[in-house]
Amino acid sequence: MNFLVTGAAGFLGSALANTLVKSGHQVRGLDDLSTGDPARLSSAVLFTRGDVQDRPKLWTLLQDVDCVYHLAARVSVQESVLYPREYNQVNVGGTVSLMEAMRDVGVKRVVFISSGAVYGEQKDQPVSERAIPIPASPYAVSKLSAEYYVQTIGMLWKIETVVLRVFNAYGPGQPLPAAHAPVVARFLRQATGDGSLVVYNGGHQTRDYVYVDDVVEGMAAAAEAPGVDRRIINIGSGAETSVLNLADQIIRQTKHGEILKTPHEEGGVSRLCADLTLARQLLGYRPQYSLAEGLRLTVERDPRFQRVAVP
């Protein structure tokens, strides 16, 4: 098959693009490189630097494409609180621009990578796709809005649409920005640097941490799975882990670091875990990596965390 991957130089986008070319597919990648790194990509990926709001460029890249994976987005919950307009412009405006270009060219399927963050605070866990979203940040609002645009434009113009709500992905190569770094990568950096793993408000908040290879498996399956048009599907590990337990596991894995608890309230919902029933039924999705195994592989495969020898 011929694929276009937007956000192809990012953490998940590059892992997906590289997996697709290894499987024998033709892959075009698009990324504005605001945060991505094209060095992540296999030489077999036909990479173009550009913006998803550049319609003429999209028209060219979409020629003869069978399926689009749309990952291009701003992805920091905390940053979105500071810059909601930019998140709306990129995450919503960019998605609409891409869907219009797909309509113009006649591409028949899109897999949109959304986020478990759209659910917000939910009483019932693990959370299923039937739950009514209660987005609690501009990032979550932008992803939910983009979902509606994808599904509505797809319905009107006969484009098959699949929405994957990915939970807290982690793994080797995950970006470590100076501010608002993802918690797994941040804790690993702190531990391997003999620092303190700062845990807020007791560390009782829970998340579903899913290893990058499992996420890629779910994304790859969505391109050809039957009966998934206009479906929303969770992609996670199905395991609920507290931040405190995550910190403990990272200290055990690296044999370095210590936990520093602070009463400061960190933003975010109290609990979030994916119900994977629909993913199993529709995609045959079964995550293979426990958190302990995923952390071991992350340390083993990411040179940033190899100051500490892996036993």
Region roles according to the model:
Residues 1-167, 289, 301, 308-311:
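N-terminal Rossmann-like NAD(P)+-binding domain of SDR-like oxidoreductases, especially those catalyzing
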Residues 15, 57-60, 64-67, 97, ...:
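Alpha-helical elements of Rossmann-like donor-binding domains used by nucleotide-donor carbohydrate transfer enzymes
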Residues 36-37, 120-121, 173, 243, ...:
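A short beta-to-alpha transition loop/helix N-cap that caps and shapes the active-site region
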Residues 52, 132, 171, 204, ...:
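Residues that form or immediately flank small-molecule/cofactor binding pockets and catalytic motifs
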Residues 53, 82, 90-93, 130, ...:
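Residue-level signal for the nucleotide or nucleotide-sugar donor/cofactor binding architecture
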Residues 125, 148-208, 212-221, 238, ...:
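NAD(P)-dependent short-chain dehydrogenase/reductase
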Residues 192-311:
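C-terminal substrate-binding subdomain of Rossmann-fold SDR/epimerase-dehydratase oxidoreductases
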